[in-house]
């Protein structure tokens, strides 16, 4: 399954707020479609599927990528759900987004793919690159890159830089100080339901 490239607000109306996908909030509180306002009792499977879709669409990853992240999280010590969120939050595209260099994760991914971002002084154009404590994430030292990020910073996606990151607006440089804490994950998600979804499919 490829990345979603359709109307973002339609997805937000169906799944709820997705801070990584869109800055917009739905004006209507019910899902899109002719029967959007109909209230039907959802099955447990439907609830788990919806949480999985929220996670995948917010971080802009494919189904195949999410399956790989779940497998990797299962091999980690501690909570599998927490490990899954850490893996997704520490991706380079998400880190660029959380530093305020882009208004959405798709916007941050574009910056990375087009070679506007460096990690520890080297251009990294792989959005899935896993940032680690101590990494220095910067805007490439050229006018075009800096102007793009300057414009993006006027309309940041989220108001606050999370506690595991720091950002110098004068030098366009961020630092990863640690792995993100669960309370700083902006997406409202029950990650255990996502793990259950894949456990039951296995």
Curated annotation (Swiss-Prot):
Family annotation (CDD domains): S4
One BP term from GO: translation
Record keywords, A-Z: Ribonucleoprotein, Ribosomal protein, RNA-binding, rRNA-binding
One Gene Ontology cellular component: small ribosomal subunit
Positions in coiled-coil regions: none
Residues annotated as signal peptide: none
Region Disordered: start-end pairs: 21-42
Pfam families: Ribosomal_S4 (PF00163), S4 (PF01479)
Keyword field contains Transcription regulation: no
Alphabetical list of InterPro entries matching this protein: Ribosomal_uS4, Ribosomal_uS4_bac-type, Ribosomal_uS4_CS, Ribosomal_uS4_N, S4_RNA-bd, S4_RNA-bd_sf
Domain S4 RNA-binding: residue ranges: 90-152
Example GO molecular function: structural constituent of ribosome
Family statement drawn from the similarity comment of this UniProt entry: Belongs to the universal ribosomal protein uS4 family.
Chain's role: One of the primary rRNA binding proteins, it binds directly to 16S rRNA where it nucleates assembly of the body of the 30S subunit. With S5 and S12 plays an important role in translational accuracy.
PANTHER family noted in UniProt: 30S 40S RIBOSOMAL PROTEIN, SMALL RIBOSOMAL SUBUNIT PROTEIN US4M
Description of how the protein assembles with itself and partners: Part of the 30S ribosomal subunit. Contacts protein S5. The interaction surface between S4 and S5 is involved in control of translational fidelity.
Protein's recorded name: Small ribosomal subunit protein uS4
The gene coding this protein: rpsD
């Amino acid at each position: 399954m490829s990345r979603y490239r359709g109307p973002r607000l339609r997805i937000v109306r169906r799944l709820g707020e997705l801070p990584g996908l869109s800055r917009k909030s739905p004006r209507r509180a019910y899902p899109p479609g002719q029967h959007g306002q109909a209230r039907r009792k959802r099955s447990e499977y439907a609830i788990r599927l919806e949480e999985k879709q929220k996670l995948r669409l917010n971080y802009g990853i494919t189904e195949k990528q999410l399956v790989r992240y779940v497998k990797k999280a299962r091999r980690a010590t501690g909570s599998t759900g927490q490990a899954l969120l850490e893996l997704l939050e520490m991706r380079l595209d998400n880190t660029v987004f959380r530093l305020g260099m882009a208004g959405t994760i798709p916007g941050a991914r574009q910056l990375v793919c087009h070679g506007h971002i460096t990690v520890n002084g080297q251009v990294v154009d792989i959005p899935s690159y896993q940032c680690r404590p101590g990494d220095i994430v910067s805007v490439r030292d050229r006018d075009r890159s800096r102007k793009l990020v300057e414009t993006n910073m006027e309309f940041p996606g989220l108001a606050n830089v999370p506690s595991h990151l720091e950002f110098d607006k004068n030098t366009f440089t961020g630092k990863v100080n640690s792995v993100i804490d669960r309370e700083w994950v902006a997406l409202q998600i029950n990650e255990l339901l996502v793990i259950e979804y894949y456990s039951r499919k296995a």
